């Protein structure tokens, strides 16, 4: 089950529920999943779990010591396990970490994000402007989610070329791309190191919690990309978990003109090298603000 399948399942589930007040009250989701929720003090790093009784009723337990936004996410994550009928595979990996996490857990995170930030509500409320620290914080507060969750949602549903990248211990773990970037085959390699020269690399090097925004070359982030183009990078580092996130974006007219195949991979020009003429070509276009 890939991301698209999970999102389709989540939206089908949402369509059967009254979500008019879902940003304040998750009980319609809980009822639709034939579940109840209880709070309990759990161990550090344990966000929650679900027990199913013989009568088919599900009991979702969440860690009362965690923040309200984290508890909301856990409820939706556990509902995902119920609706998708996926076994839990938490093992010893922290719930916030992508490293070595089972695909079931990542799928349930995707489902939970759909429930917390229903795409129709999101699109009707998100300002039609470029991302900023203030905008993402505003959306996170509006939907009762974390800053990284809101940043990822912004990138994946944006009309502009936009991406969201999660990095742990100096390596890329996950990247979400807007439709505009997927259509041109933009790719950020998982498990690659944080690129030197990026905002993410700069702020992680400080060793402190930090947020910053700056322009960087597009080809720092995207594989096999045209040089001479720039993008904006908004990055935040969480020192305690050594986690870094970045939102990358630029104007549509700064997209390179490329062809992609039916798998979304870029088609490289295979016509060979141009004949040498003895004349130097003009430099490629470079757009900076």
Regions found by a protein language model. Give the residues of each.
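Active-site hotspot residues in diverse enzymes, especially metal/ion-binding acidic/histidine motifs
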Residues: 1-289
């Amino acid at each position: 089950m890939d991301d698209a399948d999970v999102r389709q399942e989540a939206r089908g589930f949402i369509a059967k529920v009254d979500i008019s007040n879902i940003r304040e009250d998750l009980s319609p989701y809980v009822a639709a999943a034939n579940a109840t929720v209880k709070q309990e003090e759990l161990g550090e790093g344990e966000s929650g779990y679900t027990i199913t009784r013989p009568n088919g009723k599900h009991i979702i337990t969440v860690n009362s010591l965690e923040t309200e936004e984290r508890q909301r996410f856990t409820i939706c994550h556990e509902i995902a396990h119920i609706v998708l009928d996926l076994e839990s595979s938490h093992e010893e990996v922290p719930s916030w970490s992508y490293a070595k996490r089972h695909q079931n857990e990542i799928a349930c995170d995707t489902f939970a994000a759909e429930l917390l930030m229903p795409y129709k509500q999101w699109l009707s409320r998100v300002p039609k402007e470029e991302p900023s620290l203030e905008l993402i914080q505003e959306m996170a507060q509006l939907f009762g989610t974390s800053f990284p969750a809101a940043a990822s949602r912004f990138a994946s549903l944006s009309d502009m070329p936009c991406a969201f990248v999660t990095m742990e211990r100096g390596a890329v773990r996950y990247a979400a791309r807007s439709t505009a970037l997927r259509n041109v085959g933009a790719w950020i390699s998982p498990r690659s190191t944080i690129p030197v020269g990026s905002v993410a690399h700069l702020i992680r090097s400080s060793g402190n919690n930090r947020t910053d925004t700056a322009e960087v070359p597009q080809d720092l982030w995207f594989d096999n990309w045209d040089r001479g183009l720039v993008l904006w990078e908004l990055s935040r580092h969480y020192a305690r978990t050594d986690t870094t996130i970045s939102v990358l974006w630029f104007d549509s007219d700064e997209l390179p003109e490329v062809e992609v195949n039916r798998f979304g991979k870029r088609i490289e020009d295979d016509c060979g090298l141009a004949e040498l003429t003895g004349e130097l070509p003009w430099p490629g276009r470079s757009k900076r603000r």
